Amino acid sequence: MRARSSRGVASVAAGVLAFLSLLISANPAAAAEVTVTGAGSTWSQIAVDQWRADVASQSGLRINFSGVGSSAGRQFYLISQVDFAVSEIPFQPDEVAKLRASNRSWQYLPIVAGGTALMYNLKDASGRQIRDLRLSASTIAGIFTGRITNWSDAAITADYGRALPAKTIIPVVRSDGSGTSAQFSAYLARTSGSDWSRFASAQGIPNAATSNYPQFGSAVASKGSDGVANYVAGGSTGVGSIGYVETGFAVQRGFPVVAVKNASGNFALPSAANVAIALTKATLNSDNTQNLDGVYANTNKASYPISSYSYMITPTTGLNPDKGAVLGKFMLYFACAGQQKASVLGYSPLPPNLIKVVFDAVKKLPGAPAVPAINKSTCANPTLSGTLGEGASSAPKGSSAAATSGGGGTGAAATTGGAASGAAAAAGGIAATHAAAGSASGTGQYAA
């Protein structure tokens, strides 16, 4: 077993080196002198920052990125203050009108998949950290609309299987325009019954997903995913709090995330395998944006229901060709070798059909670098080898796999994708499903 593992590591390393040599072979001097700038999503920022560091150290590419939130990132792109943006939701109708009026071109391409997790800080009566919390969609909606305000509420007891101490719940929401808020509220709007519609009406917001989550009742609003995660993890002041972040932010801090009840009645954690399984029911619109209705309704026992993709937004015209070359090399890197780190960072890697979407987008850039064929020798994305990378089937660090064995659950093995074969099935299944559904039309699920 050890010998096979060593050969596998050597093979991956050789593939990464070959890919990096491809990236720097074309005009390395120009690449070293050009800086490409982007802004946007904090949901994706852990991955983007890792990839920026990788290409800077390995090939000298200079990529700047500011995690200012999806809404601000789109605005910076709209007024040409950045070369690319990253967002969990596409441009809204008013933004599209401004883009067209200014002749600013754009295209969407997926960069990474992940789960929007509910990170929490909760202790039992003896003061020990609770790490196996389970909640249903109705209970989550109750907490994040103000209907449920105490951890001893009967709905929480029913989901978790035992009573929690009587303590006020502190929901932590985003204070800034956020793709994370949009993804989370889209889930609530689709799964919570009347909770979200009543809340939306009371708050004067559309009965749909929103980038600007209202502050309500005992809720605390924090800026950025880091702000939400830091509040929840913030010592005594964070006890009793629960906030929505991309899984990686909880993993970084060693804090637990909720096992969410899915459409099968099972409770699932946002492991890379569970996210990949959930996204086998996602469909792509003609512009490569996502429709997640099937994800929320996915009846696979392992499916994590609050799963989604994040997009990069780039121009197809009007970009300096030298910048286009650098941006294109960065895109080729994160679609391939960069995805090896997705699972350990708290994400799930892009499947083969979405690698192709990225490669096709690179070809549309001014000054685009050479784009290789997609295979294991040119692209070190783990899904091309039928896996999701290291740690794909594990419970996120800080969370107990016991969270998946309550209620209608059937144990951690069932809900975390089991052994490596479960992750491999997810890697293959998501590609096949997206390939079949790639031309689905959208449903207008987002509202600014």
PLM ranges: what are they?
Residues M1-A31, A448:
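Secretory targeting and sorting signals
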Residues A31-G438, G444-Y446:
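Flexible loop/hinge segments at secondary-structure junctions
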